[in-house]
Amino acid sequence: MSVSVRDARVSALDRRWIESVYREYLDDLAPLNTGIFPVLGEVGHREPDQLTRWYADSSARILTICKSAAPVGFAMVLPGRPTPGRSAPDFRMAEFFVARPYRRLGIGQSAVALILDRFAGLWEVQEYLRNPGAVKFWRHVIADYTRGDYEERVANGEVRQTFRSGPSRTRKG
């Protein structure tokens, strides 16, 4: 399996592909009912508007996840934000999505490792406790990538992992 990650900003085809699966991504998030994500079709909330904001943010690293060079997912990496009592991490995973037909094949885990190696530094990943699939995925992927060398905090309905990344990390496998 050949997994790669590329900059989505350089390809109009990648942007169109992300636009084509964005509704599926929001459908995955809808059951969380956090109030953060717009209800599809609501007046004033349109998928293209959300994506336009992503692409307008010069600090956002929008990535296309590929299997054998074909798009199968996307990720968005943003600069970290400080939290009370802690300095800001270098990076945070703001969005991460693998299309349904490509899940549970190891593509997501491989893509995460490529992204973490590409953006070396202090990371934070956050999931909602109401999303047990995401919590399980990120705990597994981060534990494997860091070989258990990460911190996790659970508060206010969120799980946050912080850890260091970089290509010098030795992972199992």
What are these regions (language model features)?
Residues S4-P31:
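A short beta-loop-alpha structural element at the N-terminal edge
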Residues I36-I62:
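Active-site rim helix/loop that mediates acceptor-substrate recognition in acyltransferases
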Residues I62-T64, A70-G80, R92, F97:
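Conserved beta-strand in the GNAT
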Residues G80-M93, R103:
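A conserved beta-turn-beta hairpin within the catalytic core of GNAT-like acetyltransferases
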Residues M93-R104, E127-L129:
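A short, internal acetyl-CoA/4′-phosphopantetheine-binding micro-motif in the GNAT/acyltransferase core
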Residues V98, R104-D117:
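Conserved acetyl-CoA-binding loop-helix of GNAT-fold acetyltransferases
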Residues E124-R139, A143, R153-N156, F163-R164:
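Conserved beta-strand-loop-alpha-helix junction that forms the acyl-donor binding cleft
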Residues G148-Y150:
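Glycine-rich ATP-binding loops of the HATPase_c
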